[in-house]
A protein has these predicted regions:
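Active-site-proximal, substrate-binding regions of enzyme catalytic domains
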Residues: 1-118, 124-154
Length: 154
């Protein structure tokens, strides 16, 4: 099974490598699919945010760099899907100005059989868009959310 992780999963939940995906999704094998748009979203958070989100984005980007560029193995295979070329008509018709739509468009044009793809997100709009387009969807259990660090006052 191919699983597409939305950026909110990568930023707000424990490491994708610590989640028992086979148990969560009731499958034998999992390949993590990273799209160009998700990587851009992570890079933007790494460059523009401050504090915990920036730190988390840097860690996520670094791990994917180790795996995809450095050739290091991870717990799960990772596949990179570059942003697909879209004509002006496709950009308008599929509303590709929305990042979620671009992610789904990229997967559809990657050559993967969408019957083998599950979109994992905590974003209701993303899950609805994916479901409407025929993808399997999965909302990750909150037990995998990163623990909030106590504030200085606590």
């Amino acid at each position: 099974m191919y699983i597409v992780l939305d950026s909110n999963i990568l930023l707000h939940y424990i490491s994708f490598e610590e989640i028992p995906w086979q148990d969560e999704l009731s499958c034998d094998e999992v390949t993590i699919v990273l799209t160009g748009m998700v990587l851009e979203e992570i890079d933007k958070k790494k460059d523009d945010e401050k504090g915990k989100i920036q730190k988390r984005a840097k860690a996520v980007a670094s791990r994917f760099k180790e795996i995809l560029i450095g050739g290091k193995s991870g717990k799960y295979p990772v596949m990179f899907v570059e942003s697909a070329y879209a004509t002006e008509d496709e950009r308008r018709r599929f509303h590709l100005d929305r990042n979620d739509n671009q992610i789904l468009f990229d997967i559809r044009n990657s050559g993967l059989d969408i019957a083998d793809v599950t979109v994992v997100s905590s974003d209701t709009a993303m899950l609805l868009r994916a479901k409407q387009q025929g993808y399997k969807i999965y909302q990750l259990n909150d037990k995998y959310l990163l623990q909030e660090e106590p504030s200085k006052d606590e």
